[in-house]
From Swiss-Prot:
GO terms for biological process: carbohydrate metabolic process; glucosamine catabolic process; N-acetylglucosamine catabolic process; N-acetylneuraminate catabolic process. One of its GO terms (molecular function) is identical protein binding. CDD domains: GlcN6P_deaminase. It comes from Streptococcus pyogenes serotype M1. PROSITE patterns: GLC_GALNAC_ISOMERASE (PS01161). GO terms for cellular component: cytoplasm. InterPro entries: Glc/Gal-6P_isomerase (IPR006148), Glucosamine6P_isomerase (IPR004547), Glucosamine6P_isomerase_CS (IPR018321), NagB/RpiA_transferase-like (IPR037171). The active site is at 62 (proton acceptor), 128 (for ring-opening step), 130 (proton acceptor), 135 (for ring-opening step). This is Glucosamine-6-phosphate deaminase.
């Protein structure tokens, strides 16, 4: 696990984009993408660049259960607003949050991931150490699954909604086992509220109580953090 400290999120996005360009030069064709505030500067760099992504496939980590793609809080909407509208891909995959059978949808999405090995996976990290929506206690062997979101995650995400009651209580998420199959993982974290999770991920025991700790076992992980998020690493 390589740690890169940056001044701010803007610099972090630039470095992540440089890593992506290197990966594309080596033949990467499938990107694993994340939502939330952490990767926004990275997507801004992609949008500003002259690069064409129309031969690439993207697979997103997760989607809320119960939100249509037109909801401005759906991750499908987020990706279109922040990346896909400006930079079309050959194919974009996200779980269907309105599937009538969410367990069947999880299995369908898992098959999509199996058919498109991820070359470059972007991750954020939750305050409780979750990656994707893999909450503490999730098995490291888990593949795509339906998640009951923890109160801490609902509270953290409520800032994007009118009220905390509007935050969905479930999501469909790529599992930890699937994430670990990615060729390369770039994790972005900014802000003091991520410091505990980053410390546990880097130094803590590998435990399902802190899902991101499993990344210690991956051969090619780069962690991009600002000084606040890295404040407990010294």
């Amino acid at each position: 696990m390589k740690i890169i400290r940056v001044q701010d999120q803007i610099e972090g996005g630039k470095i992540a984009f440089t890593l992506l360009k290197d990966s594309l030069a080596k033949g990467a064709k499938t990107l694993g993408l994340a939502t939330g505030s952490s990767p926004i500067s990275f997507y801004q760099e992609m949008v500003k660049s002259p690069l064409d992504f129309s031969d690439l496939t993207s697979i997103n980590l997760d989607e809320y259960v119960g939100l249509s793609v037109e909801s401005d809080q759906s991750y499908d909407y987020f990706m279109r607003q922040n990346l896909f509208n400006a930079k079309p891909f050959k194919k974009n995959y996200l779980p269907n949050g309105l599937a009538t059978d969410v367990e069947a949808e999880a299995k369908r999405y898992n098959q999509i991931i199996a058919e498109h090995p991820i070359d470059f996976q972007v991750l954020g990290i939750g305050r409780n150490g979750h990656i994707g929506f893999n909450e503490p206690g999730t098995s490291f062997e888990e593949e795509t699954h339906v998640v009951d979101l923890q109160e801490s995650t609902i509270e953290a995400n409520s800032r994007f909604f009118t009220s905390i009651e509007d935050v969905p209580k479930q999501a469909i998420s790529m599992g930890i086992a699937s994430i670990m199959k990615s060729e390369m993982i770039v994790l972005l974290a900014f802000g003091q509220e991520k410091a505990d999770a980053i410390k546990g991920m880097v130094f803590g025991p590998i435990t399902e109580h802190l899902p991101a700790s499993i990344l210690q076992k991956h051969d090619h992980v780069i962690v991009i953090v600002d000084e606040a998020a890295a404040s407990q690493l010294d």
